[in-house]
Amino acid sequence: MASNLSPAASASGASASPATRVKSATSTTSQFGYPRGHVGYLSADEEEALRSFQDVLEERGLYKRGPPASHDDQTLLRFLRARRWVVEDAFRQFKDTEDWRAANSIDTLYKTIQLDAYEQSRRLYPQWTGRRDRRGIPLYVFEIRTLDSKTISEYERLGSKSTFSQAKTDGKTPPGLLRLFALYENLTRFTQPFCTQLADREHPAVPITMSTNIVDIQGVGLTQFWNLKGHMQAASQLATAHYPETLDRIFIIGAPMFFSTVWGWIKRWFDPITVSKIFVLSAHEVKPTLEAFIDPCNIPKKYGGELDYTFGQLGVPDPHWEGVIDWEEGFTGFPTGPLLWEEVDDGKRVACVTYGSKGDEPRRQRICTLPKIWPATAAPEVDAENVAEGTATKTTSTAVTMTDVSEATQTAEPKAHDDGVQTDDAITNGDAVKKLQMHDEKHAEAANSAPPALATTVA
């Protein structure tokens, strides 16, 4: 069984050395505003907002302090960040999400979904490459052309009456979309916690709570976009409402001349903060821009990098994992299907365990273990340069489990695009990296301001 589920071996044939710290050419702290606003790097106002949010949730029966706490700090922070630190707005979105999760048995869905149904969904939507960007954030790729109208119709037809799991639903969210959210659970409960436990990054004391995405729209015509409009709108709005701030940078590649029309639809599916993180790259901007944020060895060859990765395959194991992960049962990489991390060895290590069902049999197999480095026993030291002057405070997480963690760092009014965005080489000026850096600095400067609250997204 293990040999059938194990992904392809690493693209690099050379023997790998134990993990070493990955750094960008320039400090990620100054270049991206990262890790400002994350656990351990909150301003005084943000720290106060978090305490107030915890108090409100506890008073209204949605949060228990523990230990362990019912929800870790980074989970709460992503709702605060999505609502621009306005506590009551964050509460409303948090409550809506908790109600939605309970009504649709999201935890049960993820743990019991049929492996074939999960794999069918996985092959259609964003996929983890097995690699990370220069900050240690997981890199996903999404090829839109796989989502043609025939494929989506068949997908929705087969799943129109079932989530292929033991989950009971409220009947309001289409089963096909609920199956999609098993993939979001995989992001927040497997991939991000795994990347958090890898110390080969500039800020290992900060939990990984985002994802970097390459969205490839090459070969997609206007008719296909139009046919997918309803499905993608519903999926995007539900994700924005119930998995807020799971995305960081989104690089769109291969945009045709008519993309300004499509962009007019897309930007209305997301909240403004998410929209501000979407960047459309012209052909000559792709390689230099991606290399500024992702090491070439982790960029798929198709986009000018060195990674032998094809959309649809399982993630390619990273040589940096050597000496860190202890594989078991013949595995050399992570299999498809739901995966969760569980503490073992008195909390000194974490084990990856398979979930879901294969036929009538539940999957429960240990894949590997690795040292548990987060949460640390002591609070991370905060460099005053990383937080607005005079406002730095330390934040510790009370989490001992690793579930549903995702957030982002954007808090300023987005100005990345307008209705007339153009993407062809003749119009873009080729200064994508410079524009991205200026964009980040603008957001970092505004991190401690109090912009107006956003209305809660309604699916």
Write out the residue ranges for each language-model feature.
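Basic, amphipathic alpha-helical/coil surface patches used to engage anionic, phosphate-bearing ligands
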Residues: 2-459
